[in-house]
């Protein structure tokens, strides 16, 4: 496969059919950068009705003590955006960016021995030319969990490598970036303010009447093919991948993959989201549960894993199938349809295996 082109759906299905790729988890969920950023943008807009947004920043940054200063006046940041140019399943980094859409930035200098400051640079930010704040989020170490309402979230204050591109040197970029980190951290200690710097990536419903009830998860990021190449249209593309543990499924030995080559990129060409469900979970918690609760007359006795990877059940009783239609491709442009009526009977005094995969 071309390293810069996503797989077709057919190629993707053929690849995951070769071997199980669930790594011991019942559910794996993936969604792409555009989907994640649309969610973040919508939440950013909704926050203005609930007054859950950052206050304009008015502060001074001591770049070089007694010599150089930056004053930030009425500074406002827009919505967060995720990119995945540094994403790798081994460290699960994502890059977060916010642009300055309003405010003034003054750079001041003060001669040694003088008490007067001199303005050396003045910049006014707008949605067109505002400098950006960029930092890394290590999602696997960021505060995340399936809360009561199933929220998957991250915090502005939990990042690393903060850089604010309103300076002229790397030292200034880092110094200003650190100032924003300290600004965010102040929200974590103020009562009722933490949620201002926390944003939702998605929700996992955890309701009492659902069969799929998440109890925990591991979150990773996966760069798309060509994500690291700035001259490619796919630069920064990638997926957020959730490895979800469910109630009623033993995930004690589940471990997410630690290398990109252990997991195919889960979003084929043209797809923005994907959900993989473990076939063992479907069999035991959906199919078998439904058979036990139905009036089919089948009694399931026990089960065991088979060498084929499926589950073998011993059963006794009778199951009738009426009016079942199936089709078979008998050749080019020829399809046959068959009306199927059948009764499966397991004599009361003996058992036979039924394979459910």
Which residues make up each language-model segment?
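Hydrophobic membrane/lipid-contacting segments
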Residues: 2-182, 186, 190, 194-357
């Amino acid at each position: 496969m071309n390293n810069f082109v996503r797989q077709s759906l057919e190629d993707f299905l053929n690849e995951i059919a070769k071997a199980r790729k669930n790594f011991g988890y019942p559910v794996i969920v993936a969604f792409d950068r555009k989907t994640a950023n649309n969610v973040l943008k919508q939440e950013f807009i909704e926050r203005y009705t609930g007054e859950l947004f950052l206050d304009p920043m008015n502060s001074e940054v001591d770049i070089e003590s007694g010599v150089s200063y930056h004053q930030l006046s009425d500074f406002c940041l827009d919505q967060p955006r995720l990119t995945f140019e540094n994403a790798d399943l081994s460290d699960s980094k994502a890059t977060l960016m916010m642009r300055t859409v309003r405010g003034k930035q003054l750079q001041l200098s003060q001669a040694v021995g003088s008490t007067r400051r001199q303005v050396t640079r003045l910049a006014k930010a707008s949605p067109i030319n505002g400098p950006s704040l960029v930092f890394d989020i290590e999602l696997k170490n960021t505060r995340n969990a399936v809360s009561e309402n199933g929220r998957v979230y991250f915090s502005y204050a939990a990042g690393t490598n903060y850089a604010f591109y309103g300076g002229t040197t790397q030292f200034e970029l880092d110094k200003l970036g650190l100032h924003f980190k300290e600004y965010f951290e102040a929200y974590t200690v103020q009562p009722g303010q933490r949620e201002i710097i926390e944003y939702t990536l998605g929700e996992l419903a955890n309701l009492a009447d659902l069969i799929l009830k998440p109890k925990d998860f591991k979150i990773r990021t996966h760069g798309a093919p060509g994500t690291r190449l700035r001259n490619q249209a796919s630069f920064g593309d990638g997926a957020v991948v959730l490895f979800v543990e469910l109630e009623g499924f033993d995930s004690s030995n589940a471990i997410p993959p630690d290398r990109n080559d252990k997991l195919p990129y889960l979003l084929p060409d043209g797809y923005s989201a994907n959900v993989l469900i473990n076939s063992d979970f479907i069999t035991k918690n959906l199919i078998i549960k439904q058979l036990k609760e139905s009036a089919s007359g089948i009694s399931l006795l026990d089960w065991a894993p088979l060498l084929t990877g499926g589950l073998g059940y011993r059963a006794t009783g009778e199951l009738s199938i009426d009016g079942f239609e199936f089709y078979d491709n008998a050749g080019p442009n020829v399809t046959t349809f068959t009306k199927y009526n059948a009764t499966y009977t397991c004599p009361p005094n003996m058992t036979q295996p039924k394979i459910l995969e």
